[in-house]
Amino acid sequence: MRTCRAATAGKLTAVLATLVLALAACGGGLSPRAWAASVCEALTPWRAEINKLTSSTQQQMTAQTTPAQAKENLVRLFAGAEDASETARRKIDQAGVPETEHGEEISARFQASLGKVRDAYGRARDTIDGLGTGEATAFYDGVRTAVETLNKEYDASALDTSRLDSEELRQAFDEVPECR
């Protein structure tokens, strides 16, 4: 009787160990298609918000407002872009890790890219917030410089999805409806 129970317990332990190892190998991540869809669902509203804020910023640069009004509006706009970028970064973090080779690294690169964008908007906001408004020409020159710096930092932070280390993810980004 003891031998039978010991043999059954040994088999059960072996089955459970195999199951645990199999589940651990999966990593609990999302399929490449599901992860790509989650990423695009996070980035679509972010892009729309950034486009809206960019358009508003361009209008602000050409509008007939006082430097103090422009400063207030631009600080608010860049704070909005900073917040939108952090929201998108958080959503990608919440999407988890794609079940693909280098999945953790790929997820981290997406998050790092959005973190850099967020920080660039924050620096632009802080720079403009620090500008004096007594002399209009000096103020708008400072704004122009801040926006040029923002554009450079923004471009430098871009993540090229065509250079993903995973063919599965490249294909998923090309195919899922959320990314079109």
What are these regions (language model features)?
Residues 2-16:
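Bacterial N-terminal signal peptides that target proteins for export
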Residues 86-111, 123-135, 160:
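Short, solvent-exposed, charged loop/turn and helix-capping segments
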Residues 28-79, 175-179:
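Immediate post-signal-peptide N-terminus of mature secreted/exported proteins
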Residues 22-25:
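C-terminal motif of bacterial Sec signal peptides marking the signal peptidase cleavage site
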Residues 46, 53, 57, 81-84, ...:
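Amphipathic alpha-helical coiled-coil/heptad-repeat segments
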